[in-house]
Amino acid sequence: MPKIKTVRGAAKRFKKTASGGFKRKQSHLRHILTKKTTKRKRHLCHKSMVAKADQVLVVACLPYA
């Protein structure tokens, strides 16, 4: 039986936590930042967790995580 390939793009975007969840970076913080408030940018800079509904897809992309 061959090894299952890891989706490399997903491996760079998600990190598994000790409790079994996945951390992810929030979007909308790369460009066009002048119109966004400081508060909005500050809240976007923190890591977020992958939703439970999407966790199945992430696990399929990262078989050895």
Swiss-Prot record:
The keyword Ribonucleoprotein applies. It comes from the Bacteria. Residues 10-26 have a biased composition (Basic residues). Residues 1-26 are annotated as: Disordered. Keywords: Ribonucleoprotein, Ribosomal protein. Signal peptide: none annotated. GO terms for cellular component: cytosolic large ribosomal subunit. GO terms for biological process: translation. GO terms for molecular function: structural constituent of ribosome. PANTHER family: 54S RIBOSOMAL PROTEIN BL35M, LARGE RIBOSOMAL SUBUNIT PROTEIN BL35M. Belongs to the bacterial ribosomal protein bL35 family. This is Large ribosomal subunit protein bL35.
